[in-house]
Design a protein with these regions (language model features):
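Loop-centered beta-sheet repeat module
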Residues: 150-223
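A beta-strand-loop signature enriched in Asp, Gly, Thr, and Trp
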Residues: 231-268, 272, 277
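Well-ordered alpha-helical scaffold segments within catalytic/enzyme domains
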Residues: 1-3, 60-73, 114-132, 173-185, ...
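Low-complexity, Ser/Thr/Pro/Gly-enriched N-terminal "stalk/linker" regions
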Residues: 1-48, 92
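Fungal-biased detection of long, low-complexity, Ser/Thr-
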Residues: 258-336
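Solvent-exposed loop and edge beta-strand segments that line ligand/cofactor-binding
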Residues: 3-5, 41-57, 97-114, 157-170, ...
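Extended ligand-binding groove/face enriched in aromatic
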Residues: 57, 66-180
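Extended, well-ordered alpha-helical scaffold segments
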Residues: 4-15, 74-90, 129-154, 186-204, ...
Length: 336
């Protein structure tokens, strides 16, 4: 499944508007002294838009994916202009410098880090077909390298995973980072993720799916874990692991979540949960045996969740529109 041209046009329109919109802005910034002239664009010249830093990163990823799939989009030239400005050597140097500041070692760890790596993976995939994508990838490389190294240190240090359905999920971060590691040829990162995933999740059995979702989830802790294990385990080993992890099937994970208020920034996460469940299930299905009776059921549930979340990806309140289209793009296919 791919993003059709009509959807891509709408997604591009929303992403362009968001990545260039400086306010409103949710700053995650530790002050070590008087703030001075603290504006989003001055602090983060590449990723100042889309409400917060990580959303700005993954909406840039969305733009790259869209022009990769549809080079003739009506907004293609506007996308190139924005990427030229935001993914410049100078802008990325400032983003790198930010991580050297006092108390910033954990800034956007691991979610924002992983999205930078996935953005770089998408640029590298496109670079073989477009010279400007090579230029953008070259500019982003110092930040991607820095965050890949920091992620390696983090996952080596961590004796336990973070098993929640929000930004700090280690499984989600590792899925995106693994894609980057494979595309960029970062064998150390790939190996570290494989080791960590086995350590954290390899013995997991009977996932507590009855406890999902939490009210602000945009990821399923169980499904994103299964999706990561699908990426790192050999097929037969994964199939055996999945039997033990979901011995009674999907249970309540098969039902799209109820979203009580799409103008509430936390509750709007639940539309993202529908989209990320669809993404995870579609990836998991590709590893099931051809005669596995779960294939049709998992696919139908993925379709149900996509139908629940996709209509809300663009055109709604800003608390959803500044990020949801990225997750719709994940659900609609392709790497990672």
């Amino acid at each position: 499944m791919t993003i059709d041209r009509e959807l891509a046009t709408g997604f591009a329109r929303a992403a362009l508007a968001n990545v260039t919109l400086e306010y409103p802005r949710k700053l995650d910034h530790l002050l070590a002294g008087p703030p001075g002239d603290l504006t989003p664009k001055k602090v983060h010249p590449a990723f100042y838009g889309s409400y917060d830093w990580h959303s700005a990163v993954h909406m840039h990823w969305l733009l790259v994916r869209l022009v990769g799939e549809h080079p003739d989009l009506p907004q293609a030239q506007a996308v190139a202009r924005v990427l030229d400005e935001h993914l410049s050597t100078r802008a990325i140097a400032t983003e790198c410098e930010y991580f050297d500041g006092p108390g910033r070692r954990t800034f956007e760890r691991p979610y924002g880090w992983a999205w930078v790596l996935e953005l770089q993976a998408e640029l590298l995939r496109l670079a073989g077909r477009r010279g400007d994508a090579r230029r953008w990838a070259d500019a982003l490389e110092p930040l991607a390298t820095l965050l890949a190294e920091q992620l390696c240190r983090f996952i080596r240090l961590a004796p336990y995973p973070i098993r929640i359905g929000m930004h700090s999920s280690t499984a989600f971060a590792c899925i995106l980072a693994l894609d980057y590691g494979r595309v960029a040829g970062d064998k150390v990162l790939v190996a570290d993720i494989g080791t960590a995933a086995r350590k954290w999740y390899g013995e997991d059995r009977d996932a507590p799916v009855g406890y999902e979702p939490s009210l602000a989830d945009f990821l399923s802790p169980a499904l994103v874990e299964a999706q990561l294990m699908r990426e790192i385990l050999p097929l037969q080993e994964f199939r055996s692991w999945l039997e033990g992890f979901l011995p009674r099937g999907l249970g309540p994970l098969a039902t799209p979540p109820t979203v009580p208020d799409r103008t509430d920034a936390q509750l709007a996460h639940l539309d993202g949960l529908s989209l990320s469940r669809a993404w995870a299930l579609r990836r998991i299905v590709t590893a099931l045996a051809p005669d596995d009776p779960r294939r049709d059921g998992f696919t139908a549930v993925a379709d149900l969740h996509l139908a629940a979340g996709l209509p809300h990806a663009v055109g709604g309140d800003y608390v959803g529109e500044h990020w949801l289209a990225s997750f719709a793009a994940l659900a609609l296919g392709g790497s990672p």
